[in-house]
Amino acid sequence: VKDWNISRQLWWGHQIPAWYCEDCQAVNVPKPERYLEDPTSCEACGSPRLKRDEDVFDTWFSSALWPLSTLGWPEETEDLKAFYPGDVLVTGYDILFLWVSRMEVSGYHFMGERPFKTVLLHGLVLDEKGQKMSKSKGNVIDPLEMVERYGADALRFALTYLATGGQDIRLDLRWLEMARNFANKLYNAARFVLLSREGFQAKEDTPTLADRFMRSRLSQGVEEITALYEALDLAQAAREVYELVWSEFCDWYLEAAKPALKAGNAHTLRTLEEVLAVLLKLLHPMMPFLTSELYQALTGKEELALEAWPEPGGRDDKAERAFEALKQAVTAVRALKAEAGLPPAQEVRVYLEGETAPVGENLEVFRFLARADLLPERPAKALVKAMPRVTARMPLEGLLDVEEWRRRQEKRLKELLALAERSQRKLASPGFREK
């Protein structure tokens, strides 16, 4: 800790406790045991003509008392006994020595112990080019305007998502759009679950492969995300919960659950409700407003913040492996359609090789997700897509003009080969390598 100005003649702050004698010019400062009492006479000559210093302490000396004064110090208050020292202080690295170190000194001096157990330093919020924001540069992003445009939760989530390892944040508005889209995705998923309740008639209560997969992945997610929160790795926690909500829950499980819901499977509806409730809890520290609203609509409970934090359940490795094979089969079919220029909703027939048992055991889910049916025999001519566990073969006859498609592919191949040849010539040129 380096020396710092006692005062910078600011307009507001703690007034300096020094009195000047107008008779002998002595400086009177109360002793520590009487620092709350104003002196009535000069200690040197006894004159009552004392004038207090008109300046105030510098900001950082006043701020150094923040952990104490907010809890009622110097009085021995119940809050001071209960909440000092604090747990975590979150602040920018740029004021580590200006503020944090002075709070540490004040805490040790007045209370005998440091004011915080942990200090979490984050970076500065810069513009998209990495420059500090200033009115003169015209690059200031007004957070109130961002809240109005994207929502408070979106701004909060975007900043958390970007706050990696204390590094500065380059705040591009595209990140706020990402966070807003994520909030919309969550809202629509919750709306789907709530609407699925309406008029639901239970006809069976059997866990599906998708149910088992989602519960297992949720258990893993709870364990990993909780550990990240406890380690104060908030950016990685945001990334993990984003992937769990968007990809695993919305993109795969919600879609895979639709055939079971249509069949009246009560276990699937219950899984949807329970998984969504846990996801809202995991997201609540980052998106408190939306998650509270959705949780109340889902459970009827008003205070999500008072609910117990979720605990991880058991893992189902067999279900995860089987569902992964099913996902790869669906992904392969979708990729084949895209390569052939077919719309995603186009019904096709495919032949699968590899880990195909999960597809056969969950044929209705596969048909719904892939918009495809299975061929009993391997076709002689087909478009092929190989995945780590599944290979899909899709014959093109009857779907498009095969000869025309082949001509387009050959033309594209020639263009790519020509591009590769030009690139090789450039790389072989001494003049190009020297640049």
Please give the residue ranges for each predicted region.
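Cys/His-rich finger/ribbon microdomains and the adjacent scaffold used
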Residues: 1-84, 114, 118, 136, ...
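Core structural elements
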Residues: 4, 181-194, 211-221, 238-259, ...
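Acidic, turn-prone loop/beta-hairpin segments
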Residues: 40, 50, 127, 160, ...
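Secondary-structure transition/capping motifs at alpha-helix termini
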Residues: 41-51, 74-83, 106-118, 127-128, ...
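Glycine- and acidic
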Residues: 78-92, 139-144, 164-176, 202-210, ...
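Metal-dependent nuclease catalytic cores in nucleic-acid-processing enzymes
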Residues: 96-112, 330-337
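Catalytic adenosine-cofactor/nucleotide-binding cores of aminoacyl-tRNA synthetases and other
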Residues: 125-129, 133-207, 299-300, 339-351, ...
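C-terminal low-complexity, glycine/proline- and small-hydrophobic-enriched intrinsically disordered tails
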Residues: 177, 298-435
